[in-house]
């Protein structure tokens, strides 16, 4: 399912002549396991970091952290990702997509691909195929 969304985003971008696609990433139960506030131990799902690194290194991909975490925790997460060479362009927003005659992004911002367990992403089975797909797609 997520591969279908990625392929559709790439196909549409190519057809429209877009230079970038916008990818949203939830944190808990998508990139990291949830601990529901018990301690600071969080584990990354297999292939999550490798996949995020590939995407972070691309100029044609915009990474958006999509989280309901508190600001203090977001700062901690962003620093951790930065130390791992993963850079999110935005947090809970996409200022690059502006309102037009056919779309209003004041409340719901624009994105192409959504990684969120609440949207059907299954981290234990979906990260590896996404990683493999990107390796093939980008020829790494």
Where are the regions a protein language model picked out?
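HAD-like aspartate-dependent phosphatase fold
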Residues: 1-140
